[in-house]
Amino acid sequence: MSHGLLIVVHSRTGAARAMAEAAAAGAAIERELPTRLLAAEAAGPDDLLAAGGYLFAAPENLAALSGAMKDFFDRCYYPVLDRLNGRPYAALIAAGSDGTGAARQLARIATGWRLRAVAEPLIVVTGAQTPEAILAPKHLPAPDLARCEALGAALATGLAGGIF
């Protein structure tokens, strides 16, 4: 089995990126476990195949995954179908008010790949509700980033210890 944690992220305003970077910092607790943080636009099937577990980080736009993250899944879906079965994953969603639509969409894709969810989706709600607030750069509170860091650490520990 391949090893390592792959974190795939798309972010327009910085929230999902900050979440992914916090998770990567948490994953660094396992020094022997390779952790890669890739932009969704740069990640591909070979990156998925080379990893033993995944963390997907994206904003929710209009109750769905952001376009670039959806494009990542569209590009990779069939090339890795039936080749990732049973591998663990978790999700980080940055949302203005809800996040559950994107989380459900990601879970459906992961089910098709036969991935195994090892944590509930971690949704950070920014409260952005006006066009100006939605488009503005985001700076997340320390407690939200700490939750992301803890999830990254848990995934890395589970992978390194053979728990997942």
Segments and roles (model prediction):
Residues 44, 118-164:
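Glycine-rich phosphate/pyrophosphate-binding loop and the adjoining helix
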Residues 2-28:
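N-terminal beta1-alpha1 ligand-phosphate binding loop
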Residues 41-125:
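Helix-loop-strand module that forms the ligand-binding subsite of alpha/beta enzymes
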Residues 19-27, 106, 151, 155:
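Hydrophobic residues within alpha-helices
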Residues 13-14, 93-98, 141:
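Short histidine/acidic/glycine/proline-rich micro-motifs that form metal-
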Residues 4-6, 36, 90:
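A structural signal for isolated positions on well-ordered beta-strands in alpha/beta enzyme cores
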Residues 20-33, 111-116:
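Short helix-loop-beta junction
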Residues 31-42:
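A short beta-strand-loop structural module common to alpha/beta enzyme folds
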